[in-house]
């Protein structure tokens, strides 16, 4: 069995977990998440803990660790939530909230409007910062990657959209 799967997931107070065959639903203060778990993994809820183990006779131990990590992210998401911060670096690079999307000015001849999926909220503390929040870790990371993909940071001047904790590797300009 994988090392990750050996540790049970603790269910904090205020979080309700229901298991229906291979579908697990986690409800908490920030919302509700549902996921279908791989059939090669058996999930048991007991004593305010969730335990994942490979199903009997199946050799896919790695799936148990993956299922445990996904369930842990669901529990943390509905209890605390996840956030991802993006920073815009460059002259004239700006962001603002526009309805259910983010209006981005990234040096193109036209402004970009990125529509946010259900479950993700955004706020702009300043014109060059975006904070994405959600209960779903995968979804908030996907939206952040899509926004970063419009103008990834380039290595010579460092301009572009970057994660707040990202270190951009800089290159030296060509010498004459």
From Swiss-Prot:
Q: Which InterPro entries match?
A: Ribosomal_uL6-like (IPR000702), Ribosomal_uL6-like_a/b-dom_sf (IPR036789), Ribosomal_uL6_a/b-dom (IPR020040), Ribosomal_uL6_bac-type (IPR019906), Ribosomal_uL6_CS (IPR002358)
What keywords is this UniProt entry annotated with?
A: Ribonucleoprotein, Ribosomal protein, RNA-binding, rRNA-binding
Q: What does this protein do?
A: This protein binds to the 23S rRNA, and is important in its secondary structure. It is located near the subunit interface in the base of the L7/L12 stalk, and near the tRNA binding site of the peptidyltransferase center.
Self-association state and partner proteins as the record states: Part of the 50S ribosomal subunit.
Question: Could you give a GO molecular-function term held by this entry?
Answer: structural constituent of ribosome
A GO-annotated cellular component:
cytosolic large ribosomal subunit
**Protein name from the UniProt record:** Large ribosomal subunit protein uL6
Domain of life here? Bacteria
Q: Where is the composition biased (Basic and acidic residues)?
A: 151-170
Q: Which Gene3D superfamilies does the annotation name?
A: Ribosomal protein L6, alpha-beta domain
The similarity comment for this entry is:
Belongs to the universal ribosomal protein uL6 family.
Recorded hits in PROSITE patterns, A to Z, give: RIBOSOMAL_L6_1
**One GO process term, biological-process aspect:** cytoplasmic translation
What are the start and end residues of every segment in region (Disordered)?
A: 151-176
